[in-house]
Amino acid sequence: MASLIYRQLLTNSYTVDLSDEIQEIGSTKTQNVTINLGPFAQTGYAPVNWGPGETNDSTTVEPVLDGPYQPTSFNPPVDYWMLLAPTAAGVVVEGTNNTDRWLATILVEPNVTSETRSYTLFGTQEQITIANASQTQWKFIDVVKTTQNGSYSQYGPLQSTPKLYAVMKHNGKIYTYNGETPNVTTKYYSTTNYDSVNMTAFCDFYIIPREEESTCTEYINNGLPPIQNTRNIVPLALSARNIISHRAQANEDIVVSKTSLWKEMQYNRDITIRFKFASSIVKSGGLGYKWSEISFKPANYQYTYTRDGEDVTAHTTCSVNGMNDFNFNGGSLPTDFIISRYEVIKENSYVYVDYWDDSQAFRNMVYVRSLAANLNSVICTGGDYSFALPVGQWPVMTGGAVSLHSAGVTLSTQFTDFVSFNSLRFRFRLTVEEPSFSITRTRVGGLYGLPAAYPNNGKEYYEVAGRLSLISLVPSNDDYQTPITNSVTVRQDLERQLGELREEFNALSQEIAMSQLIYLALLPLDMFSMFSGIKSTIDAAKSMATSVMKKFKKSGLANSVSTLTDSLSDAASSISRGASIRSVGSSASAWTDVSTQITDVSSSVSSISTQTSTISRRLRLKEMATQTEGMNFDDISAAVLKTKIDRSTQISPNTLPDIVTEASEKFIPNRAYRVINNDEVFEAGTDGRYFAYRVETFDEIPFDVQKFADLVTDSPVISAIIDFKTLKNLNDNYGISRQQAFNLLRSDPRVLREFINQDNPIIRNRIEQLIMQCRL
C-alpha cells in the first residue's frame, strides 16, 4: 500500500557523496544552538599578524553635560545653558551688554530674616536688602538695572534644594529659572545685542545645549548625577574646550596600506538598521478550533536612508535562533481551543540581522579584518492576534516584549530572490521587558518574552542606529570587483522556496478527490512512482532518492524506529507477564516506551487519558511492524502527498527531501488506533481520548487499560480511519450490519470506497477531516 514509501525510506541503505554532505551542511537550519564565531570567522584570508583594530567615535557627538569648568569670564555661545553650581552664598553670576542691561544673580542661604548686605556687582559695592524665609531651601535672586548708574530691582526668585541655577542667551533674550524646586519654570529678560553679552561666573559651571533643556531642568529640580558630586571630578579651565581632538570621522574611507595590486581600506560608517519579524501561523484541519503551529520565519526588508547627504539603499534579513516552544490545550473535545505549538523568544534566544547596502564599503567585502560596531538597543513589543473561532468569543494573544542588545558582528551571505551578496550579520542578545504576554479567555497569563503571533505590533519596521568600522583588502583598481566567496548562513534561499511550497501544499487540500485518494492509498508506491510528477525525475532519480532518504534519516519517525530497535533488544530477556500494572508497563516498553513514564498506575496521579495518549504515540510503529490488509493513516498521508506533489508547481528536487520528511511527521497529527478482541474493541487516540465498546451494539464498556496494554503487545494494531464516534453516528442514522461494522473497524478500503461512491455524508466528512489534517 501507499505507506510502503515510508517503510522503504526507513529500511533502505543509502550512500552519501561528499559534495552532497557539504551542500547539506550549508543549507541546514539549526535551532537552539548559538556558536560565537568571533570577528575573524569566514574571512577566507590567509593568517597574518593583523592588529585588533578600533571602534571609532564621531566628532558630531555632543555631550549632554559638558564640564565642570572653573570660574571665568567669557562670552558664552548662543543657545547653550550655563548650569551654575555654587557652593556658598554670594554673587553667582553677572552679565551685561554695557548698554541697557546689567543682570546679576545672588544666592542666599536658608533661614535669613530681612537684612541689608553688601555685594560687589560689576566692580562696585552695592547695598542689597535680602531675605529667605525657607528653613531648607536656598534662594537665587536676580538683581537688574537698565542704566549704568541706576538702582537695582529684584526679580525671580528661585527657591532651590539642589542649589543649582542656569542662564542662557536665546532669541534676543536672556533666560533664567524661577519658581520652586522641583517645579521650576523659565523666564526671560529682553536684551539688545544679546549675543554680545559677556558672563562672569563666580563658581564652577557646566554647559548644556538647548536641545537638552529638559535635562537641564531635571538637574535644576533634582540635582546633578551622583558621579558629578564626587571629589574625583576636577573642574577644568574653559580653554580646554578649544583643544582639537583628532578623531576618526563617522563616515570616511582611509587607505591603510597599498601595493601595486591590493590595498587595505578602512571604512567608517554611520549605519541605520531597519528590520522586521515574520511569522507563520498554521491552522489545523477540523472544525476550526485548533492551530498547529505559530512560528518565526526569516523576513527580508529593503529601504533607503540618507547618510552624509548620500542616499543609501539597504537590505536586511532578520532571523531568530534559540526559540522557546509553548503550547495551550483547552481540552479534548473537537470544539476546544488548542495551540499545539507557538514559539516565544526570550533571554536565551538570539536575533540575527544580516545587513547590506550599496555603498563602497560593501562592494568588495570578502577579505575583512578589524570588524567592530557600536549599536543602540531597541525594544520590540508584541501586538494583539485574535484566534477566529467559528463560534464564541475569540481568544486573543496579546502583549510581550523583549529588548535587543548588540552582541557581536560577523560576515555572512544574504540570499534574495535574484542575487546573493556578502553582508554583515549583527547578532543581538535579548532581555525580557514589560508587558508580559497572555492569551485572553484562557488561563495563560503573566508569561514573559515575545511570541511569534504578532511580533511587529503594526510597525513597518524596528530601527537600530550605530557606527561601524572595518578594514577590507580590496583591489587597487577601484573598477575591479572581487569575486564573492559565499559563506554559510542560517537561512538560505531554500527556506524561502519551502515557505512558498508549504502555502501551495496547504491550498491544494481542497482539490483532492476522495475516490482518487482511496485508489492511490491502495497502490504500492515506491520511490520512483511517488516522485514521478517532478520534472527531470529520470535524470535525477538516484541523487534525488539519496537526498530524500538522507534527510528522512534525521526525522522524528526514523529516530523513533531506532529507539524501538534498541528497546526491543533490551526488553527481549526481561519481559515478564504478570497481573500487576508495573509488569504490564515493562512488557509494553519494547514498543511503547512508557515504562519510564508509567511505573505504578495504582499510585500515579496520571489519568487513563494520559496513559493511553502516551501509548498511542508509539502505536504507529507497532502498526508498521505488523502490516495488515486494511488501510492505515500512513496510506492516506502518502496518497495525499503524492497527489499534492503531482499538482504542485513549486516542487523541485531541492525542496522534496524537506517536504517528504515534514509530511511524515506532521500529516494527520490526530490519529486513533484500535485493537479488536472478539466482540470488544479498544480504541485510543493521540489526543488522550479512549473508548471501549461492543461491535454488536456499539454500546460503550469500561476501558481496561491493563487489558488494552496486553492486547497491543500481542495483537495487530489497526488505524481507526473511521473512528468510534463516526461509526456510532453512521449506525444511528443509516444502520449498518455486523459485517459492515467489522469491515469499517478493519479499515477495509473496498467498503470505504463503496460508502464514498454512495456519497455517504458521514464517511465523506470523516475522510475530508483527515485530508484537511494533511497540512505543513
Swiss-Prot record:
- Region: Hydrophobic, residue numbers: 389-409
Family the entry assigns: Belongs to the rotavirus VP4 family.
| InterPro entries xref list | ConA-like_dom_sf (IPR013320), Rota_A_VP4 (IPR042546), Rota_VP4_MID (IPR035330), Rota_VP4_MID_sf (IPR038017), VP4_concanavalin-like (IPR000416), VP4_helical (IPR035329)
Region (Spike head) location: 65-224
GO process annotations (BP): permeabilization of host organelle membrane involved in viral entry into host cell; virion attachment to host cell
What Gene Ontology cellular component terms go with this record? host cell endoplasmic reticulum-Golgi intermediate compartment; host cell plasma membrane; host cell rough endoplasmic reticulum; host cytoskeleton; membrane; viral outer capsid
Instruction: Please indicate the residue ranges that the annotation assigns to the motif KID motif.
Output: 644-646
Q: Where is this site: Binding to sialic acid?
A: R101, S190
User: What is the protein's given name?
Assistant: Outer capsid protein VP4
The chain's coiled-coil residues are 484-511
State the organism named in the record.
Rotavirus A (strain RVA/Monkey/United States/RRV/1975/G3P5B[3])
Summarizing the annotation, the consequence of altering R231H is: Complete loss of trypsin activation of VP4, resulting in a blockage to viral entry
